[in-house]
Amino acid sequence: MKEHKARKRFGQNFLQDTRIIGDIVNAVRPQADDVVIEIGPGLAAITEPLAKKLNRLHVVEIDRDIVCRLKTLPFADKLVIHEGDVLQFDFNGISGKKKIVGNLPYNISTPLLFKLAEVADDVADMHFMLQKEVVERMVAAPKSNDYGRLGVMLQYFFDMELLIDVPPESFDPAPKIDSAVVRMIPVKHRIGKADDFEHFAKLVKLAFRQRRKTIRNNLKELADDDDLQAVGISPQDRAEHIAPEKYVALSNYLADKAV
């Protein structure tokens, strides 16, 4: 079969390190009847070992040439192929608690993670290969350089752990950056429940809009010093010093005050 060349516009870098592949499959722990969705199966490096353990495997792929290849594989009868852009994919259209796995294209990773947060209630767990820098931002704790909006928002929905470091030579073509595998497990209200999620999301976005400024300056449209101090936030603090649960508490305090 004609060799498939990675396409930059789809952010394709194909995993080829058998040890890393085995570690990812072991982390996913697929059982025969699990509902598993793989994003971007590519040349089936993870697809094949997953399919061996599953009765059925859903795959989402935008590249038509790869879709054609998938249909010719020996285990193709186990695959449910969804051709199209994963950012437009209806995850709720597949019933059951889902395990989602994938080597995510770096160029769409952040919007895709926010999209997946919206379906967290129907997810058992997720395992993704991502740019290591992104994973470090996702799992970062307050008062660290990597802590920011992405971490706060995803930590609202998930417990997350960096599982596996993946060097560039594990891929073909080799990217210019390091990668890592992250495990994401939905946890309801781990940092408290936002009474108005849209308000909470807006507040967090504003808080981190200018990292060098104080929280007083960044949130002056929404809160004054008394509001901040009411939930234990110093107006002189910067956004990266404030724990996720404090943002939830402030959002709820302001929502109650507005009623």
Curated annotation (Swiss-Prot):
SUPFAM superfamilies: S-adenosyl-L-methionine-dependent methyltransferases (SSF53335). InterPro entries: KsgA/Erm (IPR001737), rRNA_Ade_diMease-like_C (IPR023165), rRNA_Ade_Mease_Trfase_CS (IPR020596), rRNA_Ade_methylase_Trfase_N (IPR020598), rRNA_adenine_dimethylase (IPR011530), SAM-dependent_MTases_sf (IPR029063). The keyword Cytoplasm applies. Its EC number is 2.1.1.182. PROSITE patterns: RRNA_A_DIMETH (PS01131), SAM_RNA_A_N6_MT (PS51689). S-adenosyl-L-methionine binds at residues 13, 15, 40, 61, 85, 103. Keywords: Cytoplasm, Methyltransferase, RNA-binding, rRNA processing, S-adenosyl-L-methionine, Transferase. SMART domains: rADc. It catalyses: adenosine(1518)/adenosine(1519) in 16S rRNA + 4 S-adenosyl-L-methionine = N(6)-dimethyladenosine(1518)/N(6)-dimethyladenosine(1519) in 16S rRNA + 4 S-adenosyl-L-homocysteine + 4 H(+). Transmembrane segments: none annotated. It is found in: Cytoplasm. Its main location: cytoplasm. The keyword Cytoplasm applies. GO terms for molecular function: 16S rRNA (adenine(1518)-N(6)/adenine(1519)-N(6))-dimethyltransferase activity; RNA binding. It holds the Pfam family RrnaAD. GO terms for cellular component: cytosol. It comes from the Bacteria. Belongs to the class I-like SAM-binding methyltransferase superfamily. rRNA adenine N(6)-methyltransferase family. RsmA subfamily. Specifically dimethylates two adjacent adenosines (A1518 and A1519) in the loop of a conserved hairpin near the 3'-end of 16S rRNA in the 30S particle. May play a critical role in biogenesis of 30S subunits. This is Ribosomal RNA small subunit methyltransferase A.
